[in-house]
A protein has these predicted regions:
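Short, C-terminally biased terminal segments at protein or domain edges
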Residues: 1-117
């Protein structure tokens, strides 16, 4: 059930990231927009892959990749904010959602590790 909520949140986040990429491309910013587009949409893709993992180790691996992508996305968001491509309100909204997913991913990974002992 928690993974369904995480899947839903990651899909909503990916949609917001794609909209951000469109906004950045209108501002003629392409390097960071490509990076955040990849990392921000990869979170949900890896969570979706984890749903059909070949066992606990594979599940944990996919969720750890999603966590790494979420951390990378947080970096790009901060960089966009600090270089004035996005405002404080947009940064706070997206970073809050990204942080929430990171917390859920850490929890899912820890639960899977504890259940595999």
């Amino acid at each position: 059930m928690a993974n369904d909520k995480l899947s839903e949140q990651s899909m909503d986040f990916a949609v917001q990231i794609i909209n951000l990429v469109k906004q950045l491309k209108e501002q003629r910013e392409s390097i960071i927009s490509n990076q955040i587009g990849i990392s921000g949409t990869s979170i949900g893709a890896n969570i979706r892959e984890a749903k059909y993992a070949h066992g606990t180790a594979d599940f944990i691996s996919k969720m750890q990749i999603a966590l790494k992508e979420a951390n990378e996305t947080g970096y790009w968001l901060e960089l966009l904010y600090k270089t004035n491509y996005i405002g404080k309100e947009q940064y706070n909204l997206l970073e809050s959602k990204c942080k929430s997913m990171r917390a859920m991913l850490v929890s899912s990974i820890n639960t899977a590790k504890n259940n595999s002992k």
